[in-house]
Amino acid sequence: MSDLAATQLPLLPLRDVVVYPHMVLPLFVGRERSIQALEHAMTGNKQVLLVAQRHAPDDDPDVDDLYQVGTISTILQLLKLPDGTIKVLVEGSARAAIEAIDADESFSMATVRSLECEDLEAESEHEAVKTTVAHFEKYVGVSKKVPSEVLTSLSGIDDPGRLADTIAAHMSVDLAEKQNILEMSSVKARLEHLLSLIHI
């Protein structure tokens, strides 16, 4: 795994969700520190670090309650709701490891380093992708939780890493398992792991 330069970003802990690169989703934010982090991001490049917390009920998670790998994400849209909460639309861009967290009274900043994903060899890549997609199609066929449109979206994805993350996002597995996949920088390992989960 080769590492890229470190950077500082506002930290946004998430309950019960892991965000992958290229994933676009709405989040409803009510915690004051998280709102402050978002507002700070909006004054700059609109980037934040989204990281899952280990225990969803914790209102003020400390460093030990956060996973150490999150996703650098861009705020696409932010809407302040009448009840004081915020609805924000985010798009994940890159996996990142947390090196340090600087918490002040308002919000936390994380020093993070993007994790560059290891590419597959072309032949190995083609086989791994083909096998994983074929098994995922069967999974979608028997699962009531995955919309069939997901398969249509997969056909338009050329990048194996992005394809693996898209499949992972739609798997009915627990938070710890989704986090485990996020922490895998090897695309081959991700595809193989997804295959093992689909076989369960």
Task: Report residues per predicted region.
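N-terminal low-complexity, acidic/polar interaction/targeting segments
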Residues: 1-198
